[in-house]
């Protein structure tokens, strides 16, 4: 095997290891399908943005198969050619779905060197026994003009953390359970008479003074729409370059 080497290994039907092996160390991004709540946070915080035909950058190194344009029946897939194993997705993941191992040790270098902040979190256990954490403060509002209660019930079931319920012809949310993710707002696009307005105002109490990389990544999470922001050049990616430097790597490998 020539080094460095990148590959994906399916351990079983639910567990996938995304491996980056070099002479001095091995990084493994572990993904557990059973824990994924399809929140969309990993796709937003990934610092790697890929230019597609010189259009605004919307694709990162991790996301749903549709977002990644990769054929798969998994909820989330990783582009091993673009992933830099920085751990940003692990750092934000509310469902503990992703885990980064460096030489067998669970660690995120960007947190250890102070580039990404540690923050308070609210953790609870779902009915299926899996844990989920809330990492951002904000608000959520539904605009429901749907008359068919069966359609409303179907929409409330889109929530993977049991935070939504139907009250008559309206949608109620338990804000203590809601993790203010992107799942229901994305799902609402498939419902003609339901829309969602989410504001992610700030992270839980932040510890320390993180670097400018923090500011760049926060642009991808906070705000009304949580749009991915990047530059529009096929050859440059300033945020990813900054992350690579903080990880002690010179540049992103090109295909």
Residue ranges: model-predicted function:
Residues 1-27, 54, 59-75, 80-255:
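Flanking helices and flexible, charged tails adjoining ferredoxin-like Fe-S electron-transfer domains
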Residues 36-38, 151:
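Acidic, low-complexity mobile loops and tails
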Residues 40, 44-45, 49-56:
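Short, contiguous, helix-prone interaction/anchoring segments in small proteins
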Residues 27-28, 38-41:
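Histidine- and aromatic-rich ligand-binding microenvironments
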Residues 31-35:
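Local sequence-structure signature of Cys/Sec-based thiol-disulfide redox active-site neighborhoods
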């Amino acid at each position: 095997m020539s080094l460095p080497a990148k590959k994906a290994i399916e351990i079983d039907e639910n567990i996938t290891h995304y491996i980056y092996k070099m002479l001095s160390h091995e990084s493994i991004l572990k993904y557990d399908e059973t824990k994924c709540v399809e929140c969309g946070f990993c796709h937003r915080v990934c610092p790697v943005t890929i230019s597609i035909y010189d259009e605004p950058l919307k694709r990162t190194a991790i996301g749903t198969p549709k977002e990644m344009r990769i054929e798969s029946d998994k909820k989330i897939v990783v582009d091993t050619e673009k992933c830099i194993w920085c751990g940003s997705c692990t750092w934000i993941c509310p469902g503990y779905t992703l885990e980064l191992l460096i030489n067998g040790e669970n660690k995120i270098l960007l947190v250890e060197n102070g580039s990404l902040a540690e923050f308070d979190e609210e953790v609870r256990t779902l009915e299926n026994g899996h844990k989920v954490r809330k990492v951002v403060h904000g608000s959520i509002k539904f605009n429901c003009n749907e008359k068919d209660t069966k359609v409303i019930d179907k929409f409330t079931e889109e929530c993977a953390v049991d935070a939504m319920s139907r009250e008559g012809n309206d949608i109620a949310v338990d804000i203590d359970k809601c993790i203010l993710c992107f799942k229901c707002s994305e799902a609402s696009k498939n419902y003609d008479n339901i829309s969602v307005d989410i504001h992610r105002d700030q992270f839980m109490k932040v510890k320390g003074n993180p670097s400018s990389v923090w500011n760049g990544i926060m642009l991808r999470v906070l705000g009304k729409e949580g749009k991915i922001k990047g530059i529009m050049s096929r050859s440059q990616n300033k945020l990813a370059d900054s992350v690579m430097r903080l990880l002690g790597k010179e540049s992103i490998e090109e295909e």
